[in-house]
């Protein structure tokens, strides 16, 4: 198994921001460290109460420190609307091993999905092919149940625009010619802006696949919304790869398990990776559920299940 240490500067920066001691000693920890946090706009972004922001997250480094601190406390991090993402790495490679947890599940991502509330995150993996310990090689999507379906838009993109005043919706436009907005929900989340404070430009574009939404108003009057689940292959999703009969009615932290063998290249062919070093999760649907706001993948943590074995 290939091993590596994280760049010293990055680790020291994380230590300074989190107030916790960080070591560059390789430990084979089953849990991950955050390398990048670029959410789409959303109701929990910049939010001081349930979102846990402090108002000082005005640089990418501070945003990473925020996300890492949350995950160390086993607390969720929101990826915002469609396309928002987080990148993590381990202090060791994760093997594509058939002896992983319960028949070959190599890692897990913890979310808080329950029956009727899935906000699926598309998962990607990367090998540190050039050996520089940075996530700058090729990403491979882990195919899920919706991969290859006609209703899945594989090459999707959305540009988000910074609001020009406080308390405004965040406008967006996609590459299909559709315009929309992330609704400002003042009665629930009244921070001045849902546009990430550490994004320095007045607009930014996110890219990736987009799943067909399964969000609908079950009540017919806007009072009860359902975010339907997908069969398997997505973070923060109530699929069969939870490997649990627990319905998670309390919306607690719950793992979804993944196999590296599901990685595909840009042509949709098996990538046949022997190991991975980095994982990225990206909100996979562009939808909103009335007063509940935008669909946004939430993640609590990432675990090497070859080591952890479901514990």
Describe each region flagged by the PLM:
Residues 1-4, 17:
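Positively charged n-region of N-terminal signal peptides that target proteins for export
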Residues 13-15:
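C-terminal motif of bacterial Sec signal peptides marking the signal peptidase cleavage site
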């Amino acid at each position: 198994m290939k091993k590596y240490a994280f760049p010293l500067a990055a680790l020291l920066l994380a230590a300074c921001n989190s107030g916790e001691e960080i070591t560059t000693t390789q430990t084979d920890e089953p849990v991950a460290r955050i390398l990048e946090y670029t959410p789409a706009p959303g109701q929990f972004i910049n939010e001081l109460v349930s979102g846990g922001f402090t108002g000082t997250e005005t640089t990418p480094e501070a945003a990473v420190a925020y996300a890492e601190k949350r995950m160390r406390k086993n607390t969720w991090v929101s990826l915002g609307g469609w396309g928002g993402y987080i990148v993590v790495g381990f202090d060791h490679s994760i093997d594509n091993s058939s002896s992983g947890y319960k028949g070959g599940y190599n890692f897990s991502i913890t979310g808080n999905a329950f029956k009727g509330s899935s906000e699926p995150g598309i998962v990607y993996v990367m090998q540190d092919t050039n050996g520089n310990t940075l996530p700058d090689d090729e990403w491979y999507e882990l195919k899920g149940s919706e991969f290859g379906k006609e209703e899945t838009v594989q090459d999707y993109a959305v540009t988000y625009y910074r609001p020009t005043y406080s308390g405004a919706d965040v406008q967006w436009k996609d590459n299909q010619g559709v315009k929309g907005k992330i609704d400002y929900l003042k009665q629930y989340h009244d921070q001045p802006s849902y546009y990430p404070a550490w994004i320095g430009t007045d607009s930014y574009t996110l890219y990736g696949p987009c799943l067909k939404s399964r969000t609908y108003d079950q009540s017919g009057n806007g009072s009860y919304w359902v975010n339907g689940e997908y069969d398997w292959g997505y973070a923060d999703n109530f699929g069969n790869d939870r490997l649990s009969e627990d319905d998670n009615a309390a919306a607690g932290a719950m793992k979804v398990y993944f196999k590296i063998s599901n990685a595909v290249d840009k042509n949709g062919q098996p990538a046949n990776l022997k190991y991975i070093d980095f994982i990225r999760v990206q909100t996979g649907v562009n939808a909103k559920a009335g007063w509940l706001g935008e669909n946004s993948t939430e993640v609590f943590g990432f675990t090497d299940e070859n080591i952890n074995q479901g514990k």
